[in-house]
């Protein structure tokens, strides 16, 4: 299990807001291990040996980074000027992101250099999958569909509807 431990506040109090950061803990139980003290929206990669998370960098630039479960080998995979959420597909082949309230999908190509993603990115194909807006991105277990919400509604889109080169399109 990977999770973010946040700070306390005036509603919850400060007692449980110490030692914030991104943690991993075995699903069978055990002691949580700190991966990093900086980041949000953590998730495991396809192999389960890395934690992917979102970070805010210089001049408010957003990044999708990953680290080993021990917090080593920091890699920056994608950057964006305005993304508010990154979600890697369970098979590690696709990256969904929200930017300016819309939901987009692009192939995830792990390279030695970060790829700039956005609606007008040209390095890799990008497809807008939301009609109006969306948040709370999550993938189906088989990575064939992306789901998101908008207010009280839940939406889904198959990848084959977004990209002609996906099998079954």
Stretch-by-stretch model annotation:
Residues 2-23, 27, 32-65, 69, ...:
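A flexible loop/linker signature enriched in serine peptidases of the S9 family
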Residues 121-130:
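A short helix->beta-strand "capping" segment at the edge of beta-propeller domains
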Residues 137-141:
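An N-terminal, helix-rich hydrophobic module
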